[in-house]
C-alpha cells in the first residue's frame, strides 16, 4: 500500500522538443494543443518581484535597480535566517544640560536563531526602525563599475557594426526609391536598425534617441589593464602556529554569500539584503496560451490559470506489488482515477514491437483487453457510504474494486531480466472533452462539446527482483 503514495514510480512521457518522463503531478496539460507539457517545454515569464519577508511588490525595473534585493529586510550572515528589528532604551545626554540624561529608543538587528546582532560587528544603533543601516563598502566597487561601463559600451559598438554589415548586404536588393542620398543619411545617423515602415499616428519621439555619427559620439570609456604583481605579500610568521578558534572563523557558505567582501572572521560578517522572489507564468511554446498564471498580489496563493495535468488526465498508481521473480508471471494491482466530472473511457494497450518510446521496459506486461469506464469525479459521493454504486458490469478478473471515480484493475507482469529493477510500459488511450474548443452554433448532430481521444505513454517501476 505504501506504493500508492509514491507517485514517482509512475512516469508519463511528454512528447515535446525533448522527451521528458515525469510524474503526472509535475506536468501541465495544454487544452488547446491537447498535449502534456513539462517545465522544459514551456516558456517562463516573470510576472512580479516581491520580498518574501515584508511582501513588498515592485516592478521589474525597480528590482533590477536594487539588484533584486529588498531595501528594508536583511538576512542573518551567520545562519541565513531573516533578521528582526529590536528596540531598546538607551540613556542620552540632553543638548541643553549635559548633566541630565534622558531615555531614548534605539533599534538594532538581531537573529532569533543564532543570536547574532548588528552590535557584534560594531554597527551603530538607529533611531528609526526601518532603513539607514550602515553597509560595508566594497574596495573594488569603483573598478567594477568602470569595467561594467566599458563592456556595455563595447557591446553597443559591436551591435552597431553588425547592423551596418546587415544593411550593406541588403543594399543590392533595395528598391529604386531607396536612393543613394537616402542610404547616405541612413549611414550618417546610424539608422540601420530603425528602417521600419512608417505607421499611422507614429510618435516623432522615436527619433529622440538618434545622434550623429561624427562629432556627437559618446565619450569613450578607457580602462587601465590589470597588471600582474611580481611580489606577493608573505603570510604572517605565526600563520601556521597560532591556535585557531573555530567559532571566530567563517564557514565556506558564509564566505560565498558575500563574494565582494570574503569575510575571514565572524567579526567581519555584515547583514545582507534579502533576495527577492518572483511570481512567474508558464506559457505553451506551441500555441502560446497560458498554462499557469498566478495572482499578482504577493499575499495570494491562488492562480488565475492553473492547467495541471492531474486535473485532466486519468492518473495511474500502483496499489500493491507482489514478489517479482525472473520469468514468473505475477499479478499487480493498479488504480485509475478520473479527475474530470464526466465519464471517461480508458483502454490500456501494450507497446508494439520497435516502439521508440519503449526503451526502459524490462518485463512483459499483459493489460486488460476490455475498455474501462471511470465514473465522474463527485466530491460528495466519495464520502457518502449510502450512495448507490453505478452498475458498470465489471469483470471480476479485471476489476478488483470500484469506488466513486476510482477503479482498481489487475495487470500481469513477467520479468525478462535476471537482475535490476522491474519496469513495464504501456499505452493508455482515453477520451477527453475539449472545453477549450471554439464554440460553434449547435446543430442536431452536434453534441456541443468536442470529444477527442488521447494516448499517453506510461512507465511503471516495481522495484528490484527477489532472488
Swiss-Prot record:
Q: State where the protein is found.
A: Cytoplasm, Cytoskeleton; Cytoplasm, Cytoskeleton, Microtubule organizing center, Centrosome; Cytoplasm, Cytoskeleton, Stress fiber; Cytoplasm, Cell cortex
Give all Phosphothreonine modified positions: 414
Q: Which residues carry this modification: N-acetylalanine?
A: 2
Predominant localisation class: cytoplasm
Q: Which GO terms describe its cellular component?
A: cell cortex; centrosome; cytoplasmic dynein complex; dynactin complex; focal adhesion; kinetochore; sarcomere; spindle pole
Q: Please list the residues that carry the modification Phosphoserine.
A: 203
Cross-link Glycyl lysine isopeptide (Lys-Gly) (interchain with G-Cter in SUMO2): give the residues.
222
Is Cytoplasm set as a keyword in this record? yes
Specify whether Transferase is a keyword of the entry: no
Q: Which residues form a coiled coil?
A: 152-172
One Pfam family per UniProt: Dynactin_p62
Please provide the record's keywords in A-Z order.
Answer: Acetylation, Coiled coil, Cytoplasm, Cytoskeleton, Isopeptide bond, Phosphoprotein, Ubl conjugation
- Subunit: Subunit of dynactin, a multiprotein complex part of a tripartite complex with dynein and a adapter, such as BICDL1, BICD2 or HOOK3. The dynactin complex is built around ACTR1A/ACTB filament and consists of an actin-related filament composed of a shoulder domain, a pointed end and a barbed end. Its length is defined by its flexible shoulder domain. The soulder is composed of 2 DCTN1 subunits, 4 DCTN2 and 2 DCTN3. The 4 DCNT2 (via N-terminus) bind the ACTR1A filament and act as molecular rulers to determine the length. The pointed end is important for binding dynein-dynactin cargo adapters.
- Report the sequence similarity comment from the record: Belongs to the dynactin subunit 4 family.
What does this chain do? Part of the dynactin complex that activates the molecular motor dynein for ultra-processive transport along microtubules.
* Protein name, per record: Dynactin subunit 4
